[in-house]
Amino acid sequence: MCIEDPFERTPRILLSSDNHQRVSPLRNALLRAGFTVDLASDYRHLELLWHELRHDVVLFEVSHAGSVELATQSAIRIKRQDAKQFVAYLADASLQAVGLIGDAIFSRDAQRLPQALRKVLAEQL
């Protein structure tokens, strides 16, 4: 029986955003850092892809306060189906206290995101 070493492969990330202009630099930074990243066109599409592919990390980029409820509802549906699924958000400090439900909230700083994500994932093991 072969047990997979969690550090042997890079986690697969499923990323979606309410602002398509912001998501490209984030995705590119993660790709450059060696992550595998699939991009969903919106939060609903993210849920559909998650059902099909079951990524290691589900990442919601939330730019607008009006999108918090949609992102949170998607996160809750995912967590209800798989409580162990790692769900995180990318949000400004002003949005971090508005009830986002998940495992982590990261800054949208594209240069720091890969390392911050690796650190949190390593702590989860």
Regions found by a protein language model. Name each.
Residues 14-16, 58-62, 87-91, 107:
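Conserved beta-strand segments of the P-loop GTPase G domain that flank and frequently precede/overlap
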Residues 41-57:
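Acidic, metal-coordinating helix/loop segments flanking the phosphotransfer/catalytic sites
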Residues 40, 104-109:
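Short acidic-hydrophobic, aromatic-tinged amphipathic segments that line or gate anion-handling sites
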Residues 27, 50-52, 93-102:
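Short loop/helix-cap segments at secondary-structure boundaries that form the rim of catalytic
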Residues 34-42:
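Short hydrophobic/Thr-rich beta-strand motif most characteristic of the beta2 strand and flanking loop
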Residues 59-82:
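Conserved phosphotransfer microenvironments
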Residues 1-22, 27-29, 80, 95, ...:
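Non-catalytic signal-transmission and effector/linker regions of two-component phosphorelay proteins
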Residues 78-97:
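A short, hydrophobic beta-strand element within the central beta-sheet of small alpha/beta folds
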